[in-house]
Amino acid sequence: MRHTLPIAPQFYVTAPQPCPYLDGRMERKLFTALQGESADKLNDSLSQQGFRRSQNVLYRPSCAECSACLSARIDVSEFAPSRSQKRTIKRNHDLARRATSPWASEEQYELFRSYLDSRHADGGMADMDVFEFAAMIEETPIRSRVVEYKNQDSGALIGVSLTDVLSDGLSMVYSFYAPDMTKRSMGTYMILDHIEIAREAGLPYVYLGYWVPGSQKMGYKSKFSGLEVYIGGNWQKVRNPSEFTAETHPLSTDPIAEQVANIQLPDTRPTR
């Protein structure tokens, strides 16, 4: 029987642009397309190596002179809520969670716009229209869910997370919430709830995206016990977040060719 081996993913690098997290720095990303029958395997493999998904693209920071962005995940078995996090859970007891297929709605887009206008008005997604929003939610070649959080009494949509289901955990691709309900700490609450979802499903990790030491926008991620970051090809436990800094070093980043050569691709050869 004749078999055709799949084409190996091709990796590319974006042009440098201003970093959205650290002033005065430039960011650059290494990326590849996510498509075909082996998309799930590729997404699983590269997610475990610090990559993130955006629609049908997988990317990882590959800045020329900076390695401050650290891919972060929570080891569910090592997590225990702090007193503050327990209070956050209690404050949101009136919310109902609903996980659905990745379909966008006008209600979601209205919440998304409110969130962006309040929190990220100068960000790269600030001009996203309803069609681009729908593409962000719906264009997924892998198993994804939209997790909605609504007030049980009023039915108002309070928070949304676009979540990928990996072989070893949940990946919170993008989350947004009502910006005027600061006392709810919805960003933290949705992570706490995803930890519980993963625990119930027997999945060991919750992938959070990137933690950037020195960035106030990302500081909340370091407050979760069981946190791990991807450094030098390995996941390392974060015992003391203050030990991690955003300082640059001339030897802190490997050349692009070396980074690509060290990426472990899944075995996608046909088994039949």
From Swiss-Prot:
<dbReference type="Pfam" id="PF04376">
    <property type="entry name" value="ATE_N"/>
</dbReference>
<dbReference type="InterPro" id="IPR016181">
    <property type="entry name" value="Acyl_CoA_acyltransferase"/>
</dbReference>
<comment type="similarity">
    <text>Belongs to the R-transferase family. Bpt subfamily.</text>
</comment>
<dbReference type="InterPro" id="IPR007472">
    <property type="entry name" value="N-end_Aminoacyl_Trfase_C"/>
</dbReference>
<keyword id="KW-0012">Acyltransferase</keyword>
<keyword id="KW-0808">Transferase</keyword>
<dbReference type="InterPro" id="IPR017138">
    <property type="entry name" value="Asp_Glu_LeuTrfase"/>
</dbReference>
<protein>
    <recommendedName>
        <fullName>Aspartate/glutamate leucyltransferase</fullName>
        <ecNumber>2.3.2.29</ecNumber>
    </recommendedName>
</protein>
<dbReference type="InterPro" id="IPR030700">
    <property type="entry name" value="N-end_Aminoacyl_Trfase"/>
</dbReference>
<comment type="function">
    <text>Functions in the N-end rule pathway of protein degradation where it conjugates Leu from its aminoacyl-tRNA to the N-termini of proteins containing an N-terminal aspartate or glutamate.</text>
</comment>
<dbReference type="Pfam" id="PF04377">
    <property type="entry name" value="ATE_C"/>
</dbReference>
<dbReference type="GO" id="GO:0005737">
    <property type="term" value="C:cytoplasm"/>
</dbReference>
<dbReference type="GO" id="GO:0004057">
    <property type="term" value="F:arginyl-tRNA--protein transferase activity"/>
</dbReference>
<dbReference type="GO" id="GO:0008914">
    <property type="term" value="F:leucyl-tRNA--protein transferase activity"/>
</dbReference>
<dbReference type="GO" id="GO:0071596">
    <property type="term" value="P:ubiquitin-dependent protein catabolic process via the N-end rule pathway"/>
</dbReference>
<keyword id="KW-0963">Cytoplasm</keyword>
<dbReference type="InterPro" id="IPR007471">
    <property type="entry name" value="N-end_Aminoacyl_Trfase_N"/>
</dbReference>
